[in-house]
Design a protein with these regions (language model features):
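ATP/NTP-dependent adenylation/nucleotidyl-transfer catalytic domains that generate, transfer
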Residues: 1-31, 36-273
Length: 273
């Protein structure tokens, strides 16, 4: 399926889902990364700029360039955006837990609590304004369990949930090209495409380092085995991958099925095959 067809299928599915459950306005957390950027553009194409509400949720490890990219995206799209820091609620959680358990939130507990603080704010705004919360997750992250239950896994619908990370970049590039060809402002800032993806939940954090594999390699393997039905051996031969590493990765994918069971619905479209 071509990039434009993938993009439009996601937009159509998002619009149909919202209409089916009675929502005409949506809210999206804007991180300045590729997933939230592409999701926001899709939402504008589905509902119109006046019906899309962006929320920046900077935390203790958010970078200035990510905030700038999120603000630039919102300006390019002409959508309403607000900034709500998670630092105070996150610190409050830390203090309450330390008071009872005499320990500081560190590592994964700290990272996941930040993600859940963001979701509490987004859901509060959703409830207060009757805005449907749009999830921004993709299929690569879901496969690897690289997400926080009841944090960034929350949302009513995930328009990118059927696309692997490399294809999120592809459809984002395609959408920018369409805007440029029409003489319009390219909605997604160039920096969003070139910077390394990061959850920004810890100092210097990078997605691919945290997962132990780059998205391009991961996606090629997952598409070959899970979408096209190739055996692990055949996929590794064709792609030049180490079979032991591939087997380990696929075992990890299987181990995170419990997380995927709690992910929101996504477009029922056969993107690969």
């Amino acid at each position: 399926m071509k990039a434009g067809d993938k993009y439009q299928a996601c937009v159509d599915a998002l619009a149909a889902y919202a209409k089916g459950i009675g929502f005409s306005q949506v809210v999206i957390g804007l991180s300045g990364g590729i997933d939230s950027s592409v999701t926001a553009v899709m939402a504008v194409d589905a509902f119109g700029a006046k019906n899309v509400h962006g929320v920046l949720l900077p935390g203790p490890y958010s970078t200035g360039h990510s905030i700038d990219d999120a603000l630039a995206l919102a300006e390019n799209l002409g959508i309403e955006s607000h900034t709500v820091s998670i630092c105070e609620p996150f610190e409050a959680f830390e203090q309450v837990i330390r008071k009872s358990y005499k320990e500081k939130l560190e590592g994964l507990a700290s990272e996941n609590t930040q993600a859940r603080c963001r979701m509490v704010i987004l859901m509060a705004l959703s409830n207060a304004n009757r805005w449907m919360l749009v999830n921004t997750g993709n299929k690569s992250e879901a496969a690897m369990g690289y997400s926080t239950l009841y944090g960034d896994t929350a949302g009513a619908f995930a328009p990118l949930g059927g696309l692997y990370k490399t294809d999120v970049y592809e459809v984002g590039r395609w959408r920018n090209e369409q805007a440029r060809a029409a003489g319009d402002v390219e909605p997604i800032p160039e920096n969003v495409f070139v910077k390394p993806p990061s959850a920004e939940l810890a100092p210097g954090q990078k997605d691919e380092a945290s997962m132990g594999i780059d998205y391009e390699t991961l996606d090629k393997l997952l598409i070959a085995v899970q979408e096209q039905g190739q055996s692990v051996e055949d996929a590794c031969d064709a792609l030049g991958f180490d079979i032991m590493q591939a087997t380990g990765l696929l075992a990890r994918v299987d181990s995170y099925a419990f997380k995927r069971a709690q992910e929101p619905p996504f477009p029922d479209v056969k993107f690969y095959g």
